[in-house]
């Protein structure tokens, strides 16, 4: 018996398509417009924060996050950051783009989080890690206990 499970389907209605077409034809500005500002303000209010910044993608969000951490904690070019060896390039690129040095750790096959033996070996060579960029791979929450154990200050 054959089964057919579609991987996607039509989720945008005809009315939504027409609304989008009207919007595209009504302006030449598609980013950082008044609707984005209004949404940022409402989002900030809901979060209880002073500011929010909307970006184009998760990749850009990672870049902005690393840049903000570098500025906030006065990190210097070349400072070392723990990153998983098994991740997406968009988790590593922001480290390099911000002139920081990625130090790769292995993951545990039990939970795809940091492998304790790997973190222990890294600690022996690199005591001066400034922060850890952790990927919660495949939607599984990474166990951070090994990072906390060997780098309690980060």
Language-model region placement:
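Residues that form or flank phosphate/diphosphate-binding pockets in enzymes
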Residues: 15, 34, 90, 114, ...
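A short beta-strand submotif of the Rossmann-like class I SAM-dependent methyltransferase core
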Residues: 54-57, 83, 131-134
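Alpha-helical structural signal in soluble globular domains
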Residues: 42, 52, 94, 98, ...
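Conserved PLP-anchoring active-site segment centered on the Schiff-base-forming lysine
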Residues: 67-123
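Conserved PLP-binding active-site segment in aminotransferase class I/II-type PLP enzymes
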Residues: 1-76, 98
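Active-site phosphate-binding strand-loop segment of PLP-dependent enzymes
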Residues: 110-154
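Short, solvent-exposed loop/turn segments at secondary-structure junctions
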Residues: 59-60, 87-89, 137-139
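A structural micro-motif
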Residues: 50, 79, 100, 152-154
């Amino acid at each position: 018996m054959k089964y057919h499970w579609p991987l996607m389907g039509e989720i945008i209605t005809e009315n939504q398509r027409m609304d989008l077409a009207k919007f595209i034809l009504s302006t030449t500005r598609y980013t950082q417009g008044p609707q984005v500002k209004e949404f940022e303000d409402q989002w900030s209010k809901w979060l209880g924060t002073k500011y929010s910044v909307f970006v184009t993608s998760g990749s850009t969000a990672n870049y902005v996050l690393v840049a903000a951490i570098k500025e906030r904690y006065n990190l210097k070019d070349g400072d070392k950051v723990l990153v998983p060896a098994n991740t997406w390039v968009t988790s590593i690129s922001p480290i390099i783009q911000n002139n920081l040095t990625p130090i790769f750790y292995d993951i545990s096959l039990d939970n795809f989080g940091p492998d304790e033996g790997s973190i222990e070996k890294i600690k022996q060579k690199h005591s001066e890690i400034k922060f850890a960029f952790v990927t919660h791979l495949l939607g599984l929450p990474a166990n951070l206990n090994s990072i906390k154990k060997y780098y309690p200050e980060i």
